[in-house]
Amino acid sequence: MEVTSQARGMGLEMYPGTMQPAAPNTTSPELNLSHPLLGASLANGTGELSEHQQYVIGLFLSCLYTIFLFPIGFVGNILILVVNISFREKMTIPDLYFINLAVADLILVADSLIEVFNLHEQYYDIAVLCTFMSLFLQVNMYSSVFFLTWMSFDRYIALARAMRCSLFRTKHHARLSCGLIWMASVSATLVPFTAVHLQHTDEACFCFADVREVQWLEVTLGFIVPFAIIGLCYSLIVRVLVRAHRHRGLRPRRQKALRMILAVVLVFFVCWLPENVFISVHLLQRTQPGAAPCKQSFRHAHPLTGHIVNLAAFSNSCLNPLIYSFLGETFREKLRLYIEQKTNLPALNRFCHAALKAVIPDSTEQSDVRFSSAV
């Protein structure tokens, strides 16, 4: 029993039948599992990574995220806010959605730094901090996903029902929709929190992130339903574009639009699927009998996996600026005008304009069905 407790203290799982009884040792009264080399060999022998190996892998992935994805998400979302606000007199309905989406994504990207440095999942051991972080992240997670879903629906309505929806797709209704989305995001977080908090007031280790009902709601309302709506809307958009371009024969324009649609759906699915699969596996597993209440969290048992899926989910907020704005002609033109206004050096203007064209070439095709940055 002493050996098992020491092994668990080092993050090693001991199962019946995985280790044979050691031969009697007359030179040492007990087996010293505190030695790092012996602990690592035991971990490797059972097919698991040692705590040090998990830390190194998590640190490496965190460095990759911080160096490559975080700057794209942080700078990209700030540029979306600054450029669109600078041209507020020319702001369109999709621009309003872009601004609100950028706000939610920017907060998520900033919060991701906390997760990057949370390699040992320390804040999950502090009930107040764990609950606060979970509430803050869920509000912005829901708002980001809800805005992506609503933008997909709005794009389909704009393309397929252009004549009928002209009276309803106004800036006033767009602002109202943004307000309702933020209210829905807050309600989807605070209402379950209030309900479950009343049931767990006597638990010292209660954390909002570990409540099964909340996790089921997060998987359903934060992934399954939005992905189904996004997939349905963009499949209908594809059908509209195929019909429109089939009569005009503009295949390059159609292929560009279809590639952007494919990128939108794939990025959302790839980034959010690991997080929701991780939560679903936890929900489908039964809690081990006799486990301490504070150690029943699935993240305690699999800290490295939890760290990886969190970084993947944050990556969606980093990639959204590239997909929704920088790949769109409207925003690129606004960005070029913004650079020209803020800089007085003609050479610098020409360099920035050439750089934008080199990275994302302009499209010269024309079409009656405009598939702009609002896709």
Curated annotation (Swiss-Prot):
It is a multi-pass membrane protein. Expressed in olfactory placode and LH-releasing hormone (LHRH) neurons (at protein level). Expressed in hypothalamus, cerebellum, olfactory placode and uterus. Belongs to the G-protein coupled receptor 1 family. The lineage of its organism: Eukaryota, Metazoa, Chordata, Craniata, Vertebrata. G-protein coupled estrogen receptor that binds to 17-beta-estradiol (E2) with high affinity, leading to rapid and transient activation of numerous intracellular signaling pathways. Stimulates cAMP production, calcium mobilization and tyrosine kinase Src inducing the release of heparin-bound epidermal growth factor (HB-EGF) and subsequent transactivation of the epidermal growth factor receptor (EGFR), activating downstream signaling pathways such as PI3K/Akt and ERK/MAPK. Keywords: Acetylation, Apoptosis, Cell cycle, Cell membrane, Cell projection, Cytoplasm, Cytoplasmic vesicle, Cytoskeleton, Differentiation, Disulfide bond, Endoplasmic reticulum, Endosome, G-protein coupled receptor, Glycoprotein, Golgi apparatus, Immunity, Inflammatory response, Innate immunity, Membrane, Mitochondrion, Neurogenesis, Nucleus, Postsynaptic cell membrane, Receptor, Synapse, Transducer, Transmembrane, Transmembrane helix, Ubl conjugation. Glycans are attached at residues 25, 32, 44. It comes from Macaca mulatta (Rhesus macaque). Homodimer. Heterodimer; heterodimerizes with other G-protein-coupled receptor (GPCRs) like CRHR1, HTR1A and PAQR8. Interacts with RAMP3; the interaction confers proper subcellular localization and function in cardioprotection. Interacts with KRT7 and KRT8. Interacts with EGFR; the interaction increases after agonist-induced stimulation in cancer-associated fibroblasts (CAF). Interacts with EGFR and ESR1. Residues 88-96, 149-175, 239-260, 329-375 are cytoplasmic. GO terms for molecular function: chromatin binding; G protein-coupled estrogen receptor activity; nuclear estrogen receptor activity; steroid binding; steroid hormone binding. The chain crosses the membrane at residues 67-87, 97-117, 128-148, 176-196, 218-238, 261-281, 308-328. GO terms for biological process: adenylate cyclase-activating G protein-coupled receptor signaling pathway; apoptotic chromosome condensation; cell differentiation; cellular response to estradiol stimulus; cellular response to glucose stimulus; cellular response to mineralocorticoid stimulus; cellular response to peptide hormone stimulus; cellular response to tumor necrosis factor. Ubiquitinated; ubiquitination occurs at the plasma membrane and leads to proteasome-mediated degradation. This is G-protein coupled estrogen receptor 1. Residues 1-66, 118-127, 197-217, 282-307 are extracellular. GO terms for cellular component: axon; axon terminus; basolateral plasma membrane; cytoplasm; cytoplasmic vesicle membrane; cytosol; dendrite; dendritic shaft.
